[in-house]
Amino acid sequence: GTLTFERADTERFPCLRLAYEAAERGGNLPAIMNAANEVAVQAFLEEKIRFTQIADIIEKAMSSFCFVQNAGLEDYFDTDRQVREELQKQL
């Protein structure tokens, strides 16, 4: 069997586009994305949101929470806590 690879369809898979953005920008953005994703997926599993809302919630979190370019360990912990607390209130 031969493996073939094609360019990822980021329109069809918007969370992949967000992951690329988080990886490219760095800082605490991957932590924002991860926390938002985990909260959104849990809300979906609890039938509080639709599956198609997950990417929207992540994207909104990535654009609204404080971005720290040179994040230290405490910044990551604080970011994770803040994102989870705020999104859990909203959802």
State what each model feature region is.
Residues 1-91:
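Catalytic, metal-anchored helix/loop core of enzyme active sites in primary metabolism
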